[in-house]
Amino acid sequence: MSQSSIEAILAKRGDILPSPPAAVGFYVPVLRTGNLVMTSGQLPMLGKELVFTGKVGSEVTRDDGYNAAKICCLNALAQIKHCLGSLDEVRRVIRVEGFVQSAAGFHDQAHVLNGASELLVDLYGEAGKHTRFAVGANELPLNAAVEVAIWVEV
């Protein structure tokens, strides 16, 4: 299978689209209904390793949180590719939903989630601009620093 134009952009950026991570609970990692594809929350996994754990603002730096969100986004894109066959099938990114395991007094969740948002705009241009929420959370599954879900239109 030839590389899609979106995957070519990823490669040019030095980013690698991983294999889609397995679900860590009783749910499906990606679902298509009509012209919408949505992912379940993706964690900052590289292979089977959770690479950023703990609270952003104490155990994890703000910039590492940003990188964690980018990894979550790459995992979400891997799920979407698994569902569609190609990331070029995405017409528009609709929504990014993000949770940041935050230390008390950490209020820069928006910067952390920019790790996902900026990647999507770099890949899809205007069609990558999306609605978003960035929520501070006390705890996340497996002690992950960040969790991201994405909705796209196809």
Go through each PLM region and give its residues.
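Short, polar/acidic, helix-capping and beta-turn segments at strand->helix junctions
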Residues: 1-154
